[in-house]
């Protein structure tokens, strides 16, 4: 077993604790979960899968996304860009190869406190009696904002003008590529009319 890989025993004992810790800090505890493993003969390093989940609800008026209009603002909500998570989307898709340097540089770091703060902003928008001012929202996952913002633009059939100088960064020495492509956690991108921005 490669040294950087957790053993099945470690995953079984520690993974539920990690899930519960994050969700409890966020304020949405994990209320169910289970393990799954292959029951037929296989070859390689055996690694069980842990699944966890919770239950949520959504207002009927928020089920469908609206269509942003030309001139609407694109907002990046959540934590700053940090020099972490570069190559995570690639690392998670590689077959038959393992590069510990890539693995560790691509590991994302969770920040439940920031996630909770971002969620409270969205909750405030969505708790209004009138319709939410957010017209379109997209999570920031693999690829960071260099993936999320173009996907948002494609889904809206619009172009986007980006100013990297306006991207909040944790490290002032980050290159444009690092600012654009890092996969820092706890971020969303959404569109909103200039008139509706609080």
Residue ranges of model-derived segments:
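Glycine/proline-enriched, intrinsically flexible loops and inter-domain linkers
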Residues: 1-198
């Amino acid at each position: 077993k490669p040294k950087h890989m957790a053993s099945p025993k470690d995953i079984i004992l520690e993974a539920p604790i990690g899930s519960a810790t994050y969700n409890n800090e966020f304020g949405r505890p994990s209320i169910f979960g289970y393990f799954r493993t292959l029951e037929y003969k296989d070859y390689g390093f055996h690694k069980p899968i842990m699944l966890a989940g919770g239950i949520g609800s959504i207002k009927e008026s928020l089920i469908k996304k609206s269509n942003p209009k030309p001139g609407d603002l694109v907002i990046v909500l959540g934590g700053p860009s940090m020099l972490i998570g570069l190559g995570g989307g690639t690392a998670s898709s590689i077959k038959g190869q393992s590069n510990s340097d890539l693995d560790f540089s691509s590991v994302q770091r969770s920040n439940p406190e920031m996630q909770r703060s971002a969620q409270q902003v969205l909750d405030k928008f969505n708790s209004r009696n009138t319709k939410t001012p957010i017209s379109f929202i997209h999570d920031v996952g693999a690829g960071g904002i260099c993936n999320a913002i173009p996907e948002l633009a494609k889904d809206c059939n619009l172009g986007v003008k980006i100013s990297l100088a306006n991207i909040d960064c944790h490290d002032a020495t980050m290159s444009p590529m690092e600012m654009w492509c890092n996969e820092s956690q706890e971020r969303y991108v959404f569109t909103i009319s200039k008139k509706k921005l609080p």
